[in-house]
A protein has these predicted regions:
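Conserved SGNH/GDSL esterase-like catalytic core that processes O-acyl groups on lipids
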Residues: 1-71
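Short, amphipathic alpha-helical "lid/cap" segments that border enzyme active or binding sites
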Residues: 33, 65, 69, 147, ...
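Substrate-gating cap/lid alpha-helix
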Residues: 99-161
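Extracellular glycan-modifying ectodomains
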Residues: 56-58, 65, 70, 74-75, ...
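Alpha-helix N-cap and loop-to-helix initiation/capping positions
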Residues: 63-68, 138-142, 185
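A structural motif corresponding to the C-terminal end of an alpha-helix
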Residues: 3-16, 75-89, 135, 139-163
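Histidine-centered active-site loop/cap adjacent to the catalytic His
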Residues: 177-207
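Active-site-proximal beta-strand/loop segments in catalytic clefts of secreted hydrolases
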Residues: 22-27, 51-56, 79, 91-95, ...
């Protein structure tokens, strides 16, 4: 897979071996700073630091937006204070809730509907099993609120940039996801994800 790291090494050979991934699946934003400190202990002056968070912090009413932003701001400050020349990329949520994708997903496996039915206004299906399109709009608005806040705190840190909406434009496709876990990309999906974000990385690090 032509990952961001492998693309970085090809474009900037001096970065080879200088890599650390301390991300943890399902982690919340308040774990970012410990992850950052762990990564910096292994690579004290990285050319690039990528921050990807929010997903597991999302609340339908976005009530915790400010606390998520504060967690991200703290992590960014730790990076910049330790390594002022490091370029920091804060990436957004991959894609947005899609009626088309969810319909396709449930058409392939009707049991998926249960996992897309929640007890809040962001549910994709109502209690009667009918598609609830207002839930897609509500969740999209919540995600946008989190990303606006993380973009705001990023803008206050030198050398920090967002992906500028590139990841927002991602379109979910069933064949890009794991057949046993539709919440995670397969190798093909991960390669597509890296390809999509690479131009943003190139501009940021001058590769």
């Amino acid at each position: 897979m032509d990952s961001v790291y492998l693309r970085m090494v090809a474009a900037l050979p001096a970065t080879e071996g200088h890599v650390s991934n301390t991300a943890t699946g399902g982690a919340s934003a308040n774990t970012l700073t410990p992850q950052v400190r762990s990564a910096l202990a292994k690579v004290p002056a990285p050319a690039l630091a990528i921050i990807q968070t929010v997903d597991n912090d999302i609340q339908c009413d976005a009530a915790n937006v400010k606390s998520v932003g504060a967690s991200v701001a703290d992590a960014l400050a730790v990076i910049h204070d330790a390594s002022p020349n490091t370029k920091i990329l804060v990436v957004g949520q991959l894609g947005r809730p899609s009626v088309t994708f969810v319909k396709d997903l449930v058409a392939h496996d009707a049991t998926k509907k249960q996992g897309l039915t929640w007890d809040d206004d962001c549910t994709f299906y109502d209690a009667q099993g009918m598609l609830h399109e207002a839930g897609f709009r509500k969740l999209t608005a919540a995600i946008d609120a989190y990303e606006a806040e993380t973009a705001r705190v990023c803008a206050a840190v030198p050398n920090c940039a967002t992906d500028g909406g590139v990841r927002r434009a991602w379109v979910d496709k069933i064949d890009l996801f794991s057949p046993v876990d539709d919440g995670h990309l397969n190798k093909q999906g991960q390669a597509a994800e890296a390809e999509q974000i690479w131009p943003v990385v190139q501009r940021l690090v001058g590769a």
